[in-house]
From Swiss-Prot:
Keywords, in A-Z order: Aminoacyl-tRNA synthetase, ATP-binding, Cytoplasm, Ligase, Magnesium, Metal-binding, Nucleotide-binding, Protein biosynthesis
The keyword Secreted belongs to this UniProt entry's keyword annotation: no
GO molecular function, one term: ATP binding
Protein name in UniProt: Phenylalanine--tRNA ligase alpha subunit
Coiled coil spans: none
Gene (UniProt): pheS
PANTHER family: PHENYLALANINE--TRNA LIGASE, MITOCHONDRIAL, PHENYLALANYL-TRNA SYNTHETASE
């Protein structure tokens, strides 16, 4: 049989075999049989060496090979579509079947308390503002009337990222920013994370949440401060809560007070309240005139108050939790009580 006739016979054989292919694996086998290293086209190449009209027959073989490759590619696409359709048909979803319920997570108790605190202040007329956790030493200390030698500026109390940048120790940095940004009246509540280089114990942690609220306007008095504190704690605890105000020193307020609430864990004294029956929950006072001046606000015309409170302390009081460390240990047995 001449080479040309042999090629024609192989072409008919290929068509016959291709028609019988019904899977991707069968197609792969057919491809190897014709185009593989030991396939039919390889044998054509060997026979071509013995022919006299190599150019014409070589061109004929190449055209046939291209033809075979094109048909194999077309068949591959057809089989792929068919196999995908079959797979999809087997994976059909019966929408009449009942769905599997997925257990939903819950908000962390501290997030819930934080939102509750902010909502109360918003209802009292405050607007929400935020500031970065990484803050300049100026906004965190200098503009808030901390002297250069104040202990809070030391590395054993504050986390320094470099000589002039710190992890903020309070959300009062919002106050420093807002006073520079706008003129009174200013009535802001500022929630966020704070960081202090402290020993971790039942009462303190290196990472905690704080909310600062401050109000600057004409004729803001100390009575306005005590009134807002009473209104807040009554709304937060949903009951009459006993408050105690103690004179204290904070660089950014004058006069300054610490706010204590009666300890609900024991009512008379435990490790949480150091056996006093009272738990400190906030620091507050009238904004220091120098802080107002640093924010380009005239203290002869305007006055204001500020209060900062720890969210963890509020959660401990509200739910009778005696150890602040429980909030950050990710123990689901503890956290799911509040979901």
């Amino acid at each position: 049989m001449e080479m040309k006739e042999e090629i024609e016979a192989v072409k008919q054989q290929f068509h016959s075999e291709l028609d019988q292919v019904n899977s991707s694996q069968a197609l792969a086998d057919l491809k190897v049989r014709y185009l593989g290293k030991k396939g039919i086209f390889r044998s054509f190449s060997e026979k071509l060496k013995q022919c006299t009209d190599k150019a014409k027959l070589g061109s004929l073989i190449n055209d046939f090979k291209t033809y075979v490759e094109d048909l194999l590619q077309e068949k591959s696409l057809v089989l792929l579509a068919s196999e995908q359709a079959e797979a999809f048909s087997k994976e059909k979803i019966d929408s009449s079947l009942p769905g599997d319920s997925q257990p939903s997570g819950g908000r962390h108790i501290l997030k819930s308390i934080l939102d509750d605190v902010v909502d109360i202040f918003v209802h009292l007329g405050f607007c929400v503002r935020e500031a970065p956790n990484i803050e300049s030493e100026a906004n965190n200390f200098t503009l808030l009337n901390f002297t250069e030698d104040h202990p809070a500026r030391q590395m054993h109390d504050t986390f320094y990222l470099n000589a002039t940048t710190v992890l903020r120790t309070h959300t009062s940095n919002v106050q420093a920013r807002e006073l520079k940004k706008q003129q009174p009246p200013i009535k802001v509540v500022a929630p966020g994370l704070c960081f202090r280089n402290e020993d971790i114990s039942a009462r303190s942690h290196v990472l905690f949440h704080q909310v600062e609220a401050f109000y600057v306007d004409h004729n803001v008095t100390f009575s306005d401060l005590t009134a807002i504190l009473s209104a807040f704690y009554h709304s937060f605890f949903q009951r009459k809560t006993e408050l105690r105000f103690r004179h204290s020193y904070f660089p950014f307020v004058e006069p300054g007070i610490e706010v204590d609430v009666s300890c609900e864990c024991c009512g008379k004294g435990c490790a949480l309240c150091k056996h006093t029956g009272w738990l400190e929950v906030a620091g507050a006072g009238m904004i220091h005139p120098q802080v107002l001046r640093n924010g380009n606000v005239d203290p002869e015309i305007y006055s204001g108050y500020a209060v900062g409170m720890g969210i963890e302390r509020l959660a401990m009081l509200k739910y009778g939790v005696s150890d602040i460390r429980l909030f950050s240990e990710n123990d689901l047995r503890f956290l799911q009580q509040f979901s």
